[in-house]
Amino acid sequence: MARELWLTHPRNFGPGSRTCRKCGNHHGIIRKYDLNMCRRCFRTDAEAIGFNKYR
């Protein structure tokens, strides 16, 4: 019964409404510069996007 109602309510705002564009994760989303990627995917793709690591 309860599983039928799981995530049926529309997510228009809040952390549940935003997903990673690569993996679909809801946690750790980087929205700055309109990246919309989770931090894990960003670490793997940062060099390809054009971000440089200076340390």
Swiss-Prot record:
Cofactor(s) required, per the database record: Zn(2+)
Keywords: Metal-binding, Ribonucleoprotein, Ribosomal protein, Zinc
Source organism, top-level taxon: Eukaryota
BP GO annotations: cytoplasmic translation
Cofactor comment: Binds 1 zinc ion per subunit.
Record-linked InterPro entries: Ribosomal_uS14, Ribosomal_uS14_CS, RIbosomal_uS14_euk_arc, Ribosomal_uS14_sf
Keyword Metal-binding listed: yes
PROSITE patterns registered for this protein in UniProt: RIBOSOMAL_S14
UniProt binding sites for Zn(2+): 20, 23, 38, 41
Pfam families cross-referenced by the UniProt entry: Ribosomal_S14 (PF00253)
Family according to the record: Belongs to the universal ribosomal protein uS14 family.
Name the record gives this protein: Small ribosomal subunit protein uS14
Organism: Dictyostelium discoideum
Biological classification of the source: Eukaryota, Amoebozoa, Evosea, Eumycetozoa, Dictyostelia
